Amino acid sequence: MTAPSQVLKIRRPDDWHLHLRDGDMLKTVVPYSSEIYARAIVMPNLAPPVTTVDAAIAYRQRILAAVPAGHNFTPLMTCYLTDSLDPDELERGFQQGVFTAAKLYPANATTNSSHGVTSTAAIMPVLERMEKIGMPLLVHGEVTHADIDIFDREARFIDTVMEPLRKQLPGLKVVFEHITTKDAADYVREGNDQLAATITPQHLMFNRNHMLVGGIRPHLYCLPILKRNVHQQALRELVASGFERVFLGTDSAPHARHRKEASCGCAGCFNAPTALGSYATVFEEMNALQHLEAFCSLNGPKFYGLPVNDSFIELERRESQVPDNIALNDDSLIPFLAGETIHWSVKK
């Protein structure tokens, strides 16, 4: 017998950390997000990065042009912080409603981050202006010194960058993005209402054993890298507790298959097609489905000072299979959980 399906109705969610890329990749991946999410914080790490108001407006138009008819989707644009960024340009974009937030990438921490910030001291006038105008700072929280082990880079960032910065600018709103460690979970939980975090589905579902034992799985390779089981469990416990300053941020980061399955493969999981069902699975496993809506749809708007969405979606508990690949010109994209059976899907 087939068990009766379970349906969860939740307010329409937002994705507070999303990579849409550009060109043909943009046109391919946008519908997977615009179908489900009402809004998304769009990352600015293009080549060249989005560092001006005009560049953000142009990129927003390219995104909107890729949204299928019938989808209601608002991209929330971000400014890529560099050592040479003009605080006046940043403020102009924020006051005009072009920039929702600004993104701090430590130089060379992740994809297309070579233009990133060399030190917070180098951009202190920009950060002081952000504190003054109430503009959120989104942080990729890893140090990038060559002598720091890749598994330690997030924890080290808290001690050497994040905590000193928040002490120096106590009024600055900070989102600690895609946290991956118990250290970060504890830090955010113990922080004040100026500090929040996003968590990806892959960091809730998997740890480094899943990526490395029995063969290397390049489609689980992302940055920050998957950590030990103890860190995965800390993240799961944080979201299952109903903690209000943590919210959905998929960090969906598409790369063509040949760039993932390579001798020097790219970091990033393309999880937009399966993320929401993945989150539901985790919350169900943790007996915390009562907190799923807040994580997906309420906590983010509250932190950003934005209204919650008026519309609703339904998640259905039924088994379905994730496609093995998604066509991309003469290549393909491998979605997160490709070929696997998933238990929650958005009801069409």
From Swiss-Prot:
The active site is at D251. CDD domains: DHOase. The modification N6-carboxylysine is found at K103. Zn(2+) 1 binds at H17, H19, K103, D251. Zn(2+) 2 binds at K103, H140, H178. Keywords: Hydrolase, Metal-binding, Pyrimidine biosynthesis, Zinc. Its cofactor is Zn(2+). Pathway: Pyrimidine metabolism; UMP biosynthesis via de novo pathway; (S)-dihydroorotate from bicarbonate: step 3/3. Binds 2 Zn(2+) ions per subunit. SUPFAM superfamilies: Metallo-dependent hydrolases (SSF51556). Catalyzes the reversible cyclization of carbamoyl aspartate to dihydroorotate. This is Dihydroorotase. It comes from Escherichia fergusonii (strain ATCC 35469 / DSM 13698 / CCUG 18766 / IAM 14443 / JCM 21226 / LMG 7866 / NBRC 102419 / NCTC 12128 / CDC 0568-73).
